[in-house]
Structure formats: C-alpha cells, structure tokens
C-alpha cells in the first residue's frame, strides 16, 4: 500500500516537473510508462488491499474423541476403515477349528516353543551345550532375554523353537535341565 502511494506521488511530481521543463518531457513520459507497467505487474492482490482485513485462519483440526463421546471425524489420511486392523499380511489371525485343547484358538502358523527360565549365565551355558544337537532336538534358539518392564525380576529367558509338538516332547524327555531352570511350554507365531 505504501509503495502504491509513493508511486502516485512520484507520478504527480513528474507531471508537475514536466510543465516546468518541456525539453525532458519525452524522457519523463517514458519513465512514467515504465512506472505504470511496473505498478500493473506488481499489483497487490485484492484480498490483501484492505489492511483492516485479517488473513484467513488455517483449517480446523480434526476433533478428538472425548471420554463418553462415541464418534470422531474420520481420518482422511488412513485407508483402513473403522473396525478393521491394519496389518502387513492378510493371514487369518485365529483358527476356530483347532483340535488341540491346550492351544484353544491359536494362530494358524503358531509353532511349539519352550521358554527356559532361570539365571542368565546358566541359560547361556545350557544353550551352548545343546547347540551341537540342534538338528535333532530343536530348530532355533534365541539369545538370552529379559522382560523390559514389570516387577524388576532379574530372571532371564531363552526360547527354543520346535518343528512339532513331538519334537518338543522328545526334547523334554531326552534333555536334563540344569538346577534352577524351568521349562515353560507354549506357542509363538512364526514370523520367519
């Protein structure tokens, strides 16, 4: 806005000077033409011409779910519909036809495992001793691990994977566990 006023004042002063000095009038008219084209090309947009008008506010944010409130505006950035779980694979999560009573409704691709629980160094030594029989006794062995949160118990775990329940049962009958080590049988999803 200030630039526009300055240009108008300059044009008025140029016109007044033209009447005083007719010899420079061709140059001044050319300068006025250049100034007029510059004003036309650098015109201020109509939305910003009125200095009293404030710039528009950003779009409103998506509403959050409030306790007791049952609806939320849909998240347009996600492609998963409400009630669905986003997953990298399309495998079935549960097997309702499972016949194993211990497994209940377990994953279709769950493998039998044993979590060996005990003192960390004892578990490492045990894993090293049974490693030479790996092909017969188990498929995989994990490193020693601990729970990150909880009651602060320093108990360590080593997880052994098996091809079948029969291989796991054979392991439990053939191998003598060291004193202080407990075997916790279970199933884990095969994420290999």
From Swiss-Prot:
The keyword Metal-binding does not apply. The keyword Calcium does not apply. Residues 38-106 are annotated as: Disordered. GO terms for cellular component: host cell nucleus. It is found in: Host nucleus. Residues 76-106 have a biased composition (Basic and acidic residues). InterPro entries: E2/EBNA1_C_sf (IPR035975), Nucleotide-bd_a/b_plait_sf (IPR012677), Papillomavirus_E2_C (IPR000427). Residues 38-47 have a biased composition (Low complexity). Belongs to the papillomaviridae E8^E2C protein family. Plays a role in limiting the replication of viral DNA in keratinocytes. Recruits the host NCoR/SMRT complex to viral replication foci to mediate repression of both viral replication and transcription. This is Protein E8^E2C.
